[in-house]
Amino acid sequence: MPTAYKRVLLKLSGEALMGDDAFGINRATIERMVADVAEVVRLGTQLAVVIGGGNIFRGVAGGAAGMDRATADYMGMLATMMNALALQDAMRHAGIEARVQSALRMDQVVEPYIRPRAIRQLEEGKVVIFAAGTGNPFFTTDTAAALRGSEIGAEVVLKATKVDGVYSADPKKDPSATRYTTISFDEAIGRNLQVMDATAFALCRDQKLPIRVFSIVKPGALKRIVQGEDEGTLVHV
């Protein structure tokens, strides 16, 4: 069956790996996510992943607690490295070939980020996991997703969250909140909808790189998106 996308960038938050736990990596949760990824890989869509680290350490929180913000952000990057290795390991157990490329060098453990190599690995059918954000403090992993997505020529950034799209208001607080099927970047800015942080959002808008926000908790959602079905919210130019 033909797919809607040839190459996609999946943004996974660190918190998504926790499942119902308060901290760390929930093995059952990561295995379920990998099963979803496996379905997409089998369809022939090239998949890259940018992973966060908030389940282990958040640079913003460290900065707020009195730690030097740059130091806290570097600690957050190391947290993403741990998540990337866990994800790669789970993929290996599921029979998926995956490579981790890091914006911070840790040569004994992972490959450094090299754009042509990443593209070649995607073309070979491997999943490429980008770790350590952009490699610079003060930039979120959402911004890393926008950056890497632009660099590798992804057709869409798939932002995996615990909510099934972008809503007019917080659905947990406002029962009348409605989900947008599609919305433009300018509309989202005008309505002050928090899809991504401002830097990431601006980069996607400038590069005309659409964002699809969807629920990673919803079974089969990732596969349905790749097959072109209506899932979550599409943010477009």
UniProtKB/Swiss-Prot annotation:
Q: Which pathway is this protein engaged in? A: Pyrimidine metabolism; CTP biosynthesis via de novo pathway; UDP from UMP (UMPK route): step 1/1
Q: Which ranges does the record mark as transmembrane?
A: none
Q: Which InterPro entries does this chain map to?
A: AceGlu_kinase-like_sf, Asp/Glu/Uridylate_kinase, Uridylate_kinase, Uridylate_kinase_bac
Q: Which SUPFAM superfamilies match?
A: Carbamate kinase-like
Keyword Cytoplasm assigned to the entry: answer is yes
Per UniProt, where does ATP bind?
A: 11-14, 54, 58, 161, 167, 170
- What's a single GO CC term here? cytosol
Q: What is the protein name stated in its UniProt record?
A: Uridylate kinase
